[in-house]
């Protein structure tokens, strides 16, 4: 069985939130591993918006599948392989029914979007 999640985010919204709440926003939404990448590479709002959209899309796919009743954004890590391709890691949560979890992220200076496929 396959489930999908999709999300679109206005980059300006994430930029405003990041400027207002900086560390509080990062700590509420992103895992320690993701925050370290943000700080190391000094990533901007476009990057954060893509990661945020991917988390939201992942959450939608997981919730629609019924294998979880709730999941926090911090539990959904959006990381990158060495070649830059994004992937989803559930930050230590083991869901035995998950066969595959794919994510695609795209963005412009105005919008970021993500599409997730969850296979059970």
Where are these regions (language model features)?
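Core catalytic alpha/beta fold that binds nucleotide/phospho-ligands
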Residues: 1-120
């Amino acid at each position: 069985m396959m489930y999908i999640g999709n999300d679109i985010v206005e980059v300006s919204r994430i930029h405003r939130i990041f400027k207002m709440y900086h560390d509080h926003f990062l700590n509420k939404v992103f895992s320690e591993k993701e925050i370290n990448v943000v700080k190391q590479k000094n990533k901007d709002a476009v990057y954060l918006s893509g990661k945020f959209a991917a988390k939201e899309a992942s959450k939608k796919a997981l919730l629609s599948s019924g294998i979880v009743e709730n999941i926090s954004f911090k539990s959904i890590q959006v990381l990158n392989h060495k070649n830059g391709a994004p992937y989803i890691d559930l930050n230590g949560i083991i869901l035995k029914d998950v066969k595959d979890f794919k994510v695609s992220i795209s963005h412009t200076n105005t919008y970021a979007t993500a599409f997730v496929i969850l296979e059970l």
